[in-house]
Amino acid sequence: MRTLVLMPTYNEVSVLESSIEQVLAQRLDLEVLIIDDNSPDGTGGLAEELSLKHPQVSVLHRDRKQGLGKAYIAGFSWAIEQGFDFVVQMDADGSHRPSDLEKLKSQAHSNRLVIGSRWTPGGRVENWPWFRQVISKAGNFYARKMLGSPVKDMTAGFRCYPTEVLKSFPLDKVQAQGYGFQVEMTLLCQDFGVE
């Protein structure tokens, strides 16, 4: 099963190489797509260098900053066009542990969204100030209650989608950005009967 890790970037030149090296060090059968929103700090150029150094790394350059949600939608479309079976969302800033990729992948199957949750047993956050944790927990609680969702961590960005599921979604209609993008995608999964 071909798996693609999507890493949207905007001004990540100081952390991108380390993040890519850590993902590739897991020695999993996967490829990485860096989606750069025309970062002024040189992230796009570094991404190109990394793609030359590592054949399993590709780069999608976008002409302007369009936001996280649009970056992921572009990555989903690219993954579908390239024939990948699964797509993993992963932050380029190192906030998701590459060592958890194997666990995330092992739970994936054709009709399941897998979320690397921070707020379930075994989950945790690292290097977050207390107020960011409070905001995240409160936002998740509010979203779950208002939307009637059983998902414990609706705003988590470390996820694995089957591309067959993504093909059935109206991705061109997804509007939300930031944490709202994760919530909207979670609701789409629920609406389409994804586990």
Model-derived segments and their meaning:
Residues 2-4, 31, 184:
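Cell-envelope/extracellular polymer assembly enzymes that use nucleotide-activated donors
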Residues 7, 30-39, 60-61, 90:
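Short beta-strand/loop segment that forms part of the nucleotide-sugar
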Residues 12-25:
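Short, well-formed alpha-helical segments that are part of the catalytic scaffolds
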Residues 23, 37-38, 66, 75:
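Conserved short acidic donor-positioning loop in nucleotide-sugar-dependent glycosyltransferases
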Residues 36-45, 94:
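A conserved acidic beta->alpha catalytic loop
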Residues 62-81, 86, 98-179:
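Acceptor/aglycone-binding surface of glycosyltransferases and processive sugar-polymer synthases
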Residues 104, 192-195:
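Short, intrinsically disordered, charge-balanced linker/junction segments flanking boundaries
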Residues 181-188:
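Short active-site alpha-helical segment characteristic of glycosyltransferases
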